[in-house]
Design a protein with these regions (language model features):
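ABC transporter nucleotide-binding domain
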Residues: 176-258
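Catalytic Walker B motif of ABC-type/P-loop ATPase nucleotide-binding domains
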Residues: 157-160
Length: 302
């Protein structure tokens, strides 16, 4: 079952410029899907379309086969959203905010209290539960915003830069919670970010969006193979020594290999050819390399 699907979805705010162009996307249930792109790429527009806050100019989208345009109430019931526009009430305490939004989502009072308590403890906000939100630091407010998105135990969680403005410790606890939701609870997490290293650590699949166009989607292996980013074998040799058929990058003689298990044979061959090897390692492609590979391909084609 696909948690999220979009078919030929386009969106224009003014009838002239397309903020999103012909989006075709399928996100399977479970796992963390990283929706990658710079500011202005169309990530927030996509989230607003999928959660029923905007209607597409063309095409249709669905969340667990529900139409956000036709069944917004049902979509909101199974979704949690943490974006900059999802505001809370400064005059209410952290606990009161969560209870209010829990009841708005249809939870009973007792269930709200229990769920709010669980989340405040998980996100290290329990001691601040009776403080007004206006007295929270930026990081605390950010974590409360995540708790708000989770209060109704959503099947799909939409997150927009969830660790922005958090200190490293808070970021780690948020990331652990996101991973746990995907692995143990089966929540589908749709994570919008432009932080590529962060996304590589957390996500199981990706979509690459640039200038309103989806350039590719899939797991890391699929994307890196498609764009031609492969594993490289790297050797560090004495100064002045060189390897034929290898490229020298950052002090390492490198060549592409198809599989990791080719490395021992290649190392033996280099040594048998009379080279002294100070160090040998496999250099795996990064999400950054894959991402910029797609962006450069788009620029060449356009």
């Amino acid at each position: 079952v696909n948690a999220i699907s979009a078919r030929h979805v386009s969106k224009s705010y003014d009838g002239k410029v397309m903020a999103l162009k012909d989006l075709d996307l399928e996100v399977p249930q479970g796992g963390v899907f990283g929706f990658l792109g710079p500011n202005g790429a169309g990530k927030t527009t996509t989230v607003k379309l999928l959660t029923g806050l905007l209607k597409p100019t063309e095409g249709e989208c669905a969340v667990f086969n529900l139409s956000p345009g036709k069944d917004p109430r049902e979509v909101h019931r199974i979704c949690g959203v943490m974006t900059e526009s999802a505001r809370m009430y400064g005059q209410l305490t952290g606990m009161e905010n969560l209870i209010f939004f829990g009841q708005t989502a249809g939870l009973k009072q007792d269930d709200c209290m229990q769920r709010a308590g669980e989340l405040l403890k998980q996100l290290d906000l329990w001691d601040a539960r009776d403080k007004k939100l206006s007295a929270y630091s930026t990081g605390m407010a950010q974590r409360l915003s995540l708790a708000r998105a989770l209060v109704n135990r959503p099947q799909v969680l939409f997150l927009d830069e969830p660790t922005s403005g958090l200190d490293p410790e808070s970021s780690q606890s948020v990331n652990e919670l996101i991973s746990e939701l995907a692995k143990n609870v089966g929540t589908t997490v749709f994570l919008c970010t432009h932080q590529l290293r962060y996304a590589q650590d957390l996500c199981s699949s990706y979509g690459i969006l640039n200038r309103g166009k989806l350039l590719a989607s899939g797991d890391f292996q699929t994307l890196s193979d498609d764009i031609g980013c492969h594993i490289k074998a790297g050797f560090r040799l004495p100064d002045g020594d060189m390897l034929d058929g290898f490229n020298l990058e950052n002090g390492w003689w490198q060549t592409e290999v198809l599989r990791e298990d080719e490395m021992p044979k290649l190392l033996k061959q280099v040594i048998d050819d009379g080279h002294s090897v100070y160090e040998a390692r496999l250099i795996k492609p990064t999400l950054e390399e894959v991402y910029f590979g797609y962006v450069e391909r788009q620029e060449v084609r356009e």
